[in-house]
């Protein structure tokens, strides 16, 4: 069989040597491309894994507290261009968690100098019922937190349109949207631009005049007629959100002190917190006005620090 195979290859070489060489070259090229593809897929997978890990590390989830805003005055704009957008900005600072281990307590003083004095004294003897307990005061090292500014702009000239049916070619749908949103009887007006995304079934409509977007947004839906069929598309404000001045910070709490050495105490935590509070309220013990005390005698607790 091996001899027959060699004879066959020899016959192929004799009858079409150029084609045989070309086939061999193509085969080698295909093998090389296949190897490169496998290598590239491995590199892509590795980079995607690293990207996911980096994304998880810098993901932020914060519940922004409700803030009451006070209306002060009305400004008269110098020209219509100042009415084209509504903008606002606010700063967000994340809370930094700290785990209080069993036998530890955190005490926060009203003044920084009191906390620093308690730390500098290091050893303190606190009377816990019949026990004169020695505790050690240490600074509280905090994990990294983040701080950034959020800028939000709401356009008075543009609107978002979603739930657009995929029934026309892209250029036809763009023309249909422009025609539909320019009809004044439906609250529309002259359209300056249509940015249509067929894949997501959405579009951004930009109007020429201020006020048209506001009229359309009052109804939340808008009629879109295609081939004598009325489709109800959803309209919503067009907003742009920017994150600026993103900062990662870490450090040591200036007013809070970590107390250790209470592992052997078996009492109600609130009673121990009151006794610690009383001890460190006294100036003769190196203390001062106490803001809050939190101790852990059983399960660890999580305390949150704000900037």
Curated annotation (Swiss-Prot):
This is N-myc-interactor. Interacts with MYCN and MYC, as well as with other transcription factors with a Zip, HLH or a HLH-Zip motif. Interacts with all STAT proteins except STAT2. Interacts with IRF7, the interaction is direct and leads to the inhibition of IRF7-mediated type I IFN production. Interacts (via coiled-coil domain) with TRIM21 (via the SPRY domain); the interaction leads to 'Lys-63'-linked ubiquitination of NMI. Interacts with IFI35; the interaction is direct and is facilitated by TRIM21. Interacts with TLR4; the interaction is direct and leads to NF-kappa-B activation. Residues 30-64 form a coiled coil. There is a cross-link at residue 22 (Glycyl lysine isopeptide (Lys-Gly) (interchain with G-Cter in ubiquitin)). The lineage of its organism: Eukaryota, Metazoa, Chordata, Craniata, Vertebrata. PANTHER family: INTERFERON-INDUCED PROTEIN 35/NMI N-MYC/STAT INTERACTING PROTEIN, N-MYC-INTERACTOR. Expressed in adult spleen, liver, and kidney. Expressed in fetal thymus, liver, placenta, spleen, lung, and kidney but not brain. Expressed in macrophages. The keyword S-adenosyl-L-methionine does not apply. Keywords: Coiled coil, Cytoplasm, Host-virus interaction, Immunity, Innate immunity, Isopeptide bond, Nucleus, Phosphoprotein, Secreted, Ubl conjugation. Belongs to the NMI family. Acts as a signaling pathway regulator involved in innate immune system response. In response to interleukin 2/IL2 and interferon IFN-gamma/IFNG, interacts with signal transducer and activator of transcription/STAT which activate the transcription of downstream genes involved in a multitude of signals for development and homeostasis. Enhances the recruitment of CBP/p300 coactivators to STAT1 and STAT5, resulting in increased STAT1- and STAT5-dependent transcription. It comes from Homo sapiens. Ubiquitinated. 'Lys-63'-linked ubiquitination by TRIM21 promotes interaction with IFI35 and inhibits virus-triggered type I IFN-beta production. One of its GO terms (molecular function) is identical protein binding. GO terms for cellular component: cytoplasm; cytosol; extracellular space; membrane; nucleoplasm; nucleus. Residues 103-192, 201-292 form the NID domain.
